[in-house]
Amino acid sequence: MKNYISFDVGGTDVKYAIISETGDILRKDFYKSPNNLDDFFREIIERTNNCEEKLSGIALSLPGAVDSVNGTIGGSSALDYIHGPNFKEILTEATDLDVEMENDANCAALAEAWLGVAKDKKDILFIVIGTGVGGAVIKDGKIHHGTNLHGGEFGYMISD
């Protein structure tokens, strides 16, 4: 069975877990969101490379307009330093693992569609309220990214 390390990056905390390919959470933890890009990547790389389990990849759930294909983040979010660098290149080089990344609201919606309250639903509207506010739209079982990767985002809002 394949295992993955998944990071859910938020404006306040980064939650991470070792997850099996069937969605079972093997273990989980969190740490405070770093204040700069160097610490951001250092935390992810150290936790990945020091993992006891054999990993098949890294999954990143990130705020902003996440370009899953090119490995970058546009737009704005509670963590302004994450916009610009190529996450896939940096993390693959440092860990020798495949990296997948997606917008955090899209990840939450996909998780609920896979194993949660929206299981077996084809059309979903999902709202996330945390340090920021975001949303996701799943239409006919697929994430609607929109022309500029803002398909489910109804505004740029940061909450206190």
Language model: regions and residue ranges:
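Short, hydrophobic/aromatic-rich segments at coil-to-beta transitions
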Residues: 1-5, 123
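Conserved phosphate-binding loops in N-terminal lobes of ATP-dependent enzymes
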Residues: 4-62, 69
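Small-residue (primarily alanine) positions within well-ordered alpha-helices
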Residues: 6, 59, 109, 135-136
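Generic beta-strand structural signal
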Residues: 9, 66-68, 129, 138
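A generic "binding-loop/recognition-motif" signal
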Residues: 12, 105-106, 150
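Glycine/GP-enriched mid-protein hinge/lid loop-to-helix segment characteristic of carbohydrate kinases
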Residues: 17-21, 30, 37, 100-102, ...
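Hydrophobic "anchor" residues
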Residues: 25, 73, 143-144
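Glycine-rich phosphate-binding loop and adjoining helix at the ATP-binding site
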Residues: 34, 38-45, 54-58, 67-123
